[in-house]
From Swiss-Prot:
<keyword id="KW-0808">Transferase</keyword>
<dbReference type="InterPro" id="IPR015421">
    <property type="entry name" value="PyrdxlP-dep_Trfase_major"/>
</dbReference>
<comment type="pathway">
    <text>Amino-acid biosynthesis; L-histidine biosynthesis; L-histidine from 5-phospho-alpha-D-ribose 1-diphosphate: step 7/9.</text>
</comment>
<feature type="modified residue" description="N6-(pyridoxal phosphate)lysine">
    <location>
        <position position="212"/>
    </location>
</feature>
<dbReference type="InterPro" id="IPR001917">
    <property type="entry name" value="Aminotrans_II_pyridoxalP_BS"/>
</dbReference>
<dbReference type="GO" id="GO:0000105">
    <property type="term" value="P:L-histidine biosynthetic process"/>
</dbReference>
<dbReference type="InterPro" id="IPR015422">
    <property type="entry name" value="PyrdxlP-dep_Trfase_small"/>
</dbReference>
<keyword id="KW-0032">Aminotransferase</keyword>
<comment type="subunit">
    <text>Homodimer.</text>
</comment>
<dbReference type="InterPro" id="IPR015424">
    <property type="entry name" value="PyrdxlP-dep_Trfase"/>
</dbReference>
<keyword id="KW-0663">Pyridoxal phosphate</keyword>
<dbReference type="InterPro" id="IPR005861">
    <property type="entry name" value="HisP_aminotrans"/>
</dbReference>
<keyword id="KW-0028">Amino-acid biosynthesis</keyword>
<dbReference type="GO" id="GO:0004400">
    <property type="term" value="F:histidinol-phosphate transaminase activity"/>
</dbReference>
<protein>
    <recommendedName>
        <fullName>Histidinol-phosphate aminotransferase</fullName>
        <ecNumber>2.6.1.9</ecNumber>
    </recommendedName>
</protein>
<dbReference type="InterPro" id="IPR004839">
    <property type="entry name" value="Aminotransferase_I/II_large"/>
</dbReference>
<dbReference type="Pfam" id="PF00155">
    <property type="entry name" value="Aminotran_1_2"/>
</dbReference>
Length: 359
């Protein structure tokens, strides 16, 4: 039997998302997935798994509500922000009819999730090197899409969207489409969060996660923050038991005041490491073409020969993320910010590579 003939045509042609773990690599310094390199201790006690969990665990909603400064009715808990990305398309887009917009170079799951759902994607690239929205092109297409996904800070560029541009976008799309801001990395630039605009704009949706600054990438816990008119429809579509009891218990622990304080200390430490790494990279001139500004826990670097650098780093046990196939990112590599020791090893390794250009 030919199983392929039973598969939806768009799935047959689908290019799946290539996660850091899927790509893999040989080494002991993993700087390819923007994970937090350190972790808090946790306790799992008196957890009973014979009962189904709450669809939206009340205590977790209250904890996150307190952390974010938003009413719990404006919060939906999901299995990481990846589920939220897909859930919004599933809820608001008609397959083979509606469109979404995303602005590359950016996170690939916006495109992949739409393709899985049979929803057309319209790519409007960020303005080259400034990495800002091309509002003129977006305005021309304003009646042709239901959702627009923006990542802020953007992955993989590390850039921030101009606040005035976001306001202009919210106004021009009002009553026509939803503006979805993915704030997976916002704890590294908290002053740039758009959560405070949710009460003013019913077409604004903000996505959050515990995977990055909270160092819980393995937990899979994220949040949709939006007007209740959006949340109530997402509740119709989300699976009945999306958040396991252990997931909820751990997330609640990490949202305690003491663990939020530890998270903020960890973020401060990573920002110091990022500044040090960037300053050291600026002293390496032969193999590096450009170092991009970053407001996140990674830095994007354009090398003169990214393929050579990528493989040399891999040979030295350092796994980074090749971005050179993405639009406007020729010869670019994204380096996650690790511990101070890991950053030091990265610099030593790139200095060795730099010497090859001299000799």
């Amino acid at each position: 039997m030919n199983i392929k003939q039973l598969v939806r045509k768009n799935i047959q042609e689908l290019q799946p998302y290539q996660s850091a773990r899927t790509i893999g690599g040989k080494g002991d310094i993993w700087l390819n997935a923007n994970e937090c390199p350190t972790f808090n201790r946790l306790k799992l006690e008196n957890i009973f798994l014979n009962r189904y969990p709450e669809c939206q665990p009340r205590e977790l909603l209250l904890r996150y509500s307190s952390y974010i400064g938003l009413d719990k009715k404006n919060i939906l808990i999901t299995r990481g922000s990846d589920e939220a990305i897909e859930l919004l398309i599933k809820t608001f887009c008609e397959p083979q009819c509606d469109r979404i917009v995303f602005c590359p170079p950016t996170y690939d799951m916006y495109n992949v999730s739409a393709n899985i759902m049979g929803v057309e994607c319209l790519q409007i690239p960020l303005l080259n090197h400034s990495w800002q929205l091309d509002l003129k092109v977006i305005k021309k297409c304003i009646n042709n899409f239901k959702l627009i996904y923006l990542c802020n800070p953007n992955n993989p560029t590390g850039s921030l969207i101009n606040f005035r541009d976001v306001l202009a976008l919210l106004k021009m799309t009002y009553g026509k489409s939803l503006v979805i801001i993915d704030e997976a990395y916002i704890e590294f630039s908290p002053m740039n969060s758009l959560v405070n605009l949710i009460s003013q704009y019913s077409n604004l949706v903000v996505l959050r996660t515990l995977s990055k600054a909270f160092s819980l990438a393995g937990l899979r816990c994220g949040f949709v923050l939006a007007n209740f008119s959006v949340i109530k429809f997402l509740l119709k579509v989300i699976n009945p038991y999306p958040i396991s009891t252990p997931t909820s218990s751990i997330a609640i622990q990490f949202l305690s005041n003491i663990n939020i304080s530890k998270m903020q200390d960890r973020v401060f430490s990573l920002i110091l490491n990022r500044c040090w790494l960037i300053n050291e990279l600026k002293l390496i001139s032969n193999c590096i073409d450009h170092i991009f500004y970053s407001a996140s826990n990674y830095v994007l670097v354009r090398f003169r020969n990214s393929n050579k650098v990528f493989h040399e780093l891999s040979n030295q046990g350092i796994i980074v993320r090749d971005q050179s196939k993405k639009i406007n990112l020729k010869n670019c590599i994204r380096i996650s910010i690790g511990t101070s020791q890991e950053c030091l090893k990265v610099i030593h390794a790139i200095r060795k590579i730099d010497c090859l250009y001299v000799n």
